[in-house]
């Protein structure tokens, strides 16, 4: 429904939480961005592709109020993803060592498409930028990064993770 779509992108510092069936909702990124475990356990597919819109690494210490707000936004939206990636890495390593039964625990291959360099230059306010040129820039950046992923990792799909979870998320 339109209300569900609004709720899925509701940033609480900008909008009131939409009410759906007596419950109030905010952007799901505050709890799971994206929630990975339902994707893993509700399919037979071993591969999960994560398209990251928030950078993981920001190399500058925030000094201004706006920069601190941007860092809080990045941390809050990445924290659940990082936690899940660490859990997946842990389970995968136990499966590979033979300490967990692969018939009971799923060996998952993680792939990521990201634009760290481009996204780390954007502030939290860019999430509200509806300028067509900006949206075209995001679209073209995504298309370019998806093409790079396919060129470099297509053969990994169904065989192995193309993302080094320890290097990227620890």
Predicted features, each with a name:
Residues 23-25, 29-170:
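Non-catalytic peripheral regions of patatin-like phospholipases
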Residues 14-20:
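Short acidic-hydrophobic surface loop/beta-edge motif
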Residues 2, 6-14, 28-35:
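Active-site glycine-rich loop that binds ribose-phosphate moieties when present
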